[in-house]
Curated annotation (Swiss-Prot):
Keyword Chloroplast found: no
Protein keywords: Amidation, Secreted, Toxin
Protein name: Cupiennin-6b
Entry GO CC: extracellular region
Originating organism: Cupiennius salei (American wandering spider)
Modified residues (Serine amide): S21
Compartments where found: Secreted
Keyword Cell membrane (UniProt): no
A molecular function (GO) term: toxin activity
Family listed: Belongs to the cationic peptide 04 (cupiennin) family. 09 subfamily.
Disulfide bonds: none
Tissue expression remark: Expressed by the venom gland.
Protein origin, superkingdom: Eukaryota
């Protein structure tokens, strides 16, 4: 479960980075 949350946060962070660019 914790692994899934970490993966989700990672994706969100990547998405935010792409949006920022």
């Amino acid at each position: 479960f914790a692994n899934t949350i970490r993966l989700l946060i990672n994706k969100v962070r990547e998405w935010k980075n792409k949006q920022s660019s």
